[in-house]
């Protein structure tokens, strides 16, 4: 992992001259497209960019390669999936390791047997409400 830092710095060295030339331009030259003016976006969309297109491709390729290298580097540290098929298979502990005198019965929070049971509400027939065999 410590060897990755010099590699990344070496890969970023070609971007330094491009960044220094971009800072020499005035801000008006740098912003052709103003995002706070969305009505002029279509006019700006067709203008040629000051940033060379091959740099975008180079940065994209470097991004893909560095992410791939980083993921391949850290992948073996994860202990799941097919790297470690027994990662979730916890060993079964024997039940004899707890002495029987130390096992406490759970306290009953509510003792239902001692509580008086509420009486059921009286049943009212449908026929009594309507007045007969309607």
From Swiss-Prot:
Signal sequence range: 1-21
Compartment(s) where it occurs, according to its Swiss-Prot or TrEMBL record: Host membrane
Protein name according to UniProt: Early E3B 14.5 kDa protein
Membrane topology: Single-pass membrane protein
Keyword terms, alphabetized: Early protein, Glycoprotein, Host membrane, Membrane, Phosphoprotein, Signal, Transmembrane, Transmembrane helix
InterPro entries cross-referenced by the UniProt entry: Adeno_E3_14_5
Lineage: Viruses, Varidnaviria, Bamfordvirae, Preplasmiviricota, Tectiliviricetes
Biological role: Down-regulates the EGF receptor and prevents cytolysis by TNF.
GO cellular component, as recorded: host cell membrane; membrane
Keyword Translocase in annotation: no
PTM comment: Phosphorylated on serine; O-glycosylated, but not N-glycosylated.
Residues passing through the membrane, by range: 54-78
GO terms classed as biological process: regulation of signal transduction
Family: Belongs to the adenoviridae E3_14 family.
């Amino acid at each position: 992992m410590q060897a990755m830092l010099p590699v990344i710095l070496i890969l970023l060295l070609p971007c330094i001259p491009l960044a220094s030339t971009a800072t020499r331009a005035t801000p008006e030259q740098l912003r052709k497209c103003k995002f706070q003016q969305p009505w002029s976006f279509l006019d700006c969309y067709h203008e040629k960019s000051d940033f060379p297109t091959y740099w975008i491709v180079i940065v994209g390729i470097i991004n893909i390669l560095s992410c791939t290298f980083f993921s391949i580097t850290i992948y073996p540290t994860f202990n799941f999936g097919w790297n470690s098929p027994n990662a979730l298979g916890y060993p079964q502990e024997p039940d004899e390791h707890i002495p029987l005198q130390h096992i406490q019965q759970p306290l009953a929070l509510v003792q239902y047997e001692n509580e008086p049971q509420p009486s059921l509400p009286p049943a009212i027939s449908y026929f009594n409400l309507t007045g007969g065999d309607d």
